[in-house]
């Protein structure tokens, strides 16, 4: 929040000075880097504010992205209304506050969280603009943004003006590069306004794409990705075993027994100390099996793995006396 406060103060007060300061930092970063790893500077001969109106927050799941989003809305509204802003910002009115999500389930989740926070919000309705547009947050799935209006889609150019655009998991859809459909939509929506993006996995999204890497290198204001989140004592302990087929076949039973014993240990610890865990919001332990397929039709390998796990559990629950 403090970084956002400093950035918005400088962005609204003197965008030219902010651009110059960022370019100085890029120069320092590039000093000891090979050319292939250097970051392109911002264009100091072009309009400054339009190169600075996109911020991103790289934050691990569970680290408070939603709470930060709520605070960012209030911060932006505060600085937009300041009377001593630079002339390019002075007196500008907010057209809409838009939250883009990847799916309807997440839209509904955000709606509930806005309600709990006391922030006016609604699911976007293309057939009518509410009286509180610009004050109420309008939530819309990014998949419904198209070039032209349709039965279940809305044209991007319907959102003209000074919009504040919030994007949850902004990297989704960036696989097409900087010219991908999603990035074009994001850029169009905040062309005369501002955008905040929030994601846990920017690194995976930009991997292998020099253009996206350069873009987000200049727009990520805060990096609290999982390595830092975990290093501060949050998140889950995990271990990844990459087993080839032969090793897995030979040791699957041993591996599942070890997992079962670990799960029992966690359950027992929780049962005996539940009252002590309650202040930390720790829930009852859960054992999850994750397959590689997310489609309705499971791949043969996934189906086979699931059957093996179910057979193991069936043997366990039907053999309480320990007989083979």
Identify the residue ranges that each predicted region occupies.
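Conserved Walker A/P-loop ATP-binding site and its immediately adjacent core
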Residues: 67-68, 83, 87-116
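Inter-Walker segment of RecA-like/P-loop motor cores
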Residues: 117-150
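Conserved pre-motif I regulatory segment
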Residues: 1-58
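Conserved C-terminal RecA-like helicase domain
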Residues: 48, 91, 131-136, 270-324
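Short hydrophobic/aromatic beta-strand immediately N-terminal to the Walker A/P-loop
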Residues: 56-58, 98, 288
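Walker A/P-loop NTP-binding motif
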Residues: 3-9, 66-90
